[in-house]
């Protein structure tokens, strides 16, 4: 065995600095801190407070509706998204080949992961399954207001229930998630549609069955692109005649179902679907949520797996992108090898919602809060201060103290910075009498107390 002589020089290598970094990285390390990647966020306490405020509201609402929380891995096989999510998301994947030569991706959405999780275990579970999650998701897309390369998302799903009651329940959860944060019907609207109804409408006006999916994908761009551009895409990409393109646009741009062409409304397939859709809206009215809901056939959702009722939530002023989107996806579990189960759900991101709360003055002011700050007059009282602090912490109180010897004035200033409600002052006299002084930091009132008074 080799050994080092005590008088021989020892050379310690820094495993980071000594790596053969390219010159531009060496310059970065030498001259400045590493920059944050574009489109990603840091969460110091002041910023984390808003994220926590949003997520806690989401959790409260989900639990009031009887949903259970779950999670999954942030890294999944890329096939889960290539086969199930549609081209738009596939083009935004953070994907790579891992050391096991597997094609993998950071999750861009949660629903395929949910389908995979349930595909392995749903057969033995009682239905309906009510689950929710708060994953961090990643998409390589252009950064703009309300859109980053990562975000936290509230996913809520009902699995195993095919009826419209589940669709109405899911949308009610989404609406209540925003109301819980102080938003009202003057702040946001839920625009709803039904892919089954839209598909029948397209067939009635003459869209070939094999062109329906492409038509929905193009129609999803309405609102983001001019109508003229969408019309050109229908003609150029799908080979529609000018007349058919106009009829398709008339369907999607109808102000209400009653404004559709009379000949279209007379078709029995259309009337059957409209009756079903009216039942869905009636349930929301019965829940007192009708003022939040508008029918909008342009809402088709871009993801390929949606099969029925779909919806998106928008701010009323139209200044932000969609706050939330969701709908029915009855075949997704089957597509990942699981039991064929009906399902409906939504995802709501924290980035655009944070923007909306800020615009409406609903972001809570960040305040540091601490129950007690323990102050000692001299080092002699330190052991007693530690005993008191630990006893209070064990009783569930938040307690801090200076970690170095400081003057009484500096300790009091530190208590103020920490947001302490009460300062506990221990001096030689108090130590001798087995008590201490409690000073209310708001009123300035002082009283002599013993530990049991605070427990």
Q: Can you name each region flagged by the protein language model?
A:
Residues 47-65, 76-77, 100-101, 111-123, ...:
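Positively charged, Gly/Ser-enriched RNA/tRNA-binding surfaces
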